[in-house]
């Protein structure tokens, strides 16, 4: 059931080309900041995806409604109408052992890790190479970094009060280096070993 007054949708996130010159062949790929959105209504929804990607559930409420602990929702996708890739949710899965199990079974190009404040959406194979068996040190570190930034911005109290629960979205572009925009953070996919494990992050000032 979709609670009255709430908005629920599916968003299909895939890739975009980033052109580095005037040539149509000189580009690299990176994850989109947003994707095609499919609004859901209570009952049966017949949807045809317009392209490939992973589906994210968007359950949007305003800050005041968050204080009332919005009711959970269930979305059922019939067998044969999608592929379960899996993702790691710190709140639900909790352990490095569960992370290792989930990422080893994943089949999609990208794998998602959701922390308290940070969400990694990185190349599956690069992530498997950089952090095959442990992720807690990485997600705790980046959750802390986002928390420090929000404290400096003066908005940490709103999260503590339960008025916001947005996540920072980190991707692994196939070009460029490191950057941040209004919508996401980029860590080039060849550098994930240096930013995923706490000891590697702390090993060099440039990480």
For each of these PLM feature ranges, what is it?
Residues 1-88:
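Beta-strand-enriched, solvent-exposed domains that form extended recognition/catalytic surfaces
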Residues 30-35, 85-90, 94-98, 140-144:
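Short linear motifs at secondary-structure transitions and domain/linker junctions
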Residues 43-45, 95, 123-126:
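Short, solvent-exposed coil/turn linker segments
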Residues 74-112:
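Low-complexity, Pro/Ser/Thr- and charge-rich linker/hinge segments at domain boundaries
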Residues 99-105, 109-207:
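Catalytic cores of extracellular degradative/oxidative enzymes
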């Amino acid at each position: 059931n979709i609670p009255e007054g709430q908005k629920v949708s599916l968003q299909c996130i895939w890739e975009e080309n980033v052109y580095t010159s005037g040539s149509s062949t000189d580009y690299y790929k990176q994850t989109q900041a947003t994707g095609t959105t499919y609004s859901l209504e209570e009952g049966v929804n017949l949807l045809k995806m317009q392209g490939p990607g992973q589906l994210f559930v968007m359950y949007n409420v305003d800050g005041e409604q968050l204080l009332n602990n919005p009711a959970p929702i269930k979305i059922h996708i019939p067998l044969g109408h999608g592929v379960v890739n899996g993702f790691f949710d710190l709140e639900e899965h909790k352990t490095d052992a569960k992370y290792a199990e989930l990422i080893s079974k994943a089949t999609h190009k990208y794998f998602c890790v959701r922390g308290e404040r940070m969400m990694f959406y990185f190349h599956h194979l690069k992530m498997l190479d950089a952090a095959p068996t442990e992720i807690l040190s990485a997600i705790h570190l980046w959750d802390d970094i986002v928390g420090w930034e929000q404290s400096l911005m003066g908005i940490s109290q709103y999260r503590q009060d339960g008025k916001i629960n947005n996540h920072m979205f980190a991707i692994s572009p196939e070009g460029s280096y490191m950057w941040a925009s209004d919508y996401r953070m980029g860590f080039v996919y060849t550098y994930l070993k240096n930013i995923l494990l706490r000891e590697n992050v702390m090993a060099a000032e440039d990480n």
